[in-house]
Regions:
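Tryptophan-centric aromatic hotspots in well-structured domains and transmembrane helices
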Residues: 91-92, 117
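Beta-hairpin (beta-strand-turn-beta-strand) motif
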Residues: 93-95, 104
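"Short basic amphipathic alpha-helical interaction patches in structured regions
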Residues: 101-113
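Aromatic sugar-binding interfaces of carbohydrate-active proteins
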Residues: 112-128
Length: 184
């Protein structure tokens, strides 16, 4: 059975340590915790090294997920005091599971407040793709998929919720919940 690989990317208005990011930085561990307890969650990229950076992922080793990378359209800083990118990479049992997580509870609260923290980018900021069960996507894969969907639009290689594809590459209509709810 295939799994859905899912990556997100955004750019903060200010580097991580800026006081305007305090509410985002406080929310981040709650958002990650909620993902890990969501139905359909399989795994997410977490660093395995002991590098003592507070904010940046650049230079970090994520084990089988690979060394951290950002898509080529990111031109921001790469040090703790200059890094402005926010990115995730995760695996899910199916597309409905990641959609349900993304548009409910604490993550929906974060989405609704994204303009407070993030700059508007002309690029696609998330991508999904299917991987065989047991395959772990890498940060390099994530960057390639983000760049691909940005250049070519949704295809079986990289797609979004609006134009999804099943594991066989056929167009797929996402079965969405009736009404997302936010508890925050």
């Amino acid at each position: 059975m295939a799994h859905v690989a899912f990556t997100t990317f955004a750019v903060l208005k200010h580097p991580y340590p800026h006081p305007d990011n305090d509410s985002f930085n406080d929310l981040e561990p709650l958002v990650f915790g909620a993902s890990e307890t969501s139905p359909g969650f399989v795994a997410r990229a977490t660093a395995v090294d002991t590098v003592t950076t507070r904010w940046t992922n650049f230079g970090r080793d994520y084990g089988e997920w690979g060394m951290f990378q950002a898509p080529s359209f990111y031109t921001g800083g790469r040090e703790d005091d200059t890094d402005t990118r926010a990115s995730t990479l995760s695996l899910w049992q199916d597309l409905e599971s990641v959609f349900a997580y993304a548009y409910s509870d604490i993550h929906l609260h974060a989405l609704r407040n994204r303009r407070e923290w993030f700059v508007h980018l002309p690029n696609r900021l998330y991508a999904a793709w299917w991987v065989p069960e047991g395959t772990v996507p890498t940060w390099q894969d994530a960057c390639e998929r983000l760049e691909y969907i940005d250049a070519h639009g949704p295809t079986p290689r990289a797609f979004d919720f609006r134009e999804a594809f099943d594991a066989d590459g056929s167009p797929y209509t996402l079965r969405r919940p009736a009404s997302p709810k936010a508890s925050a």
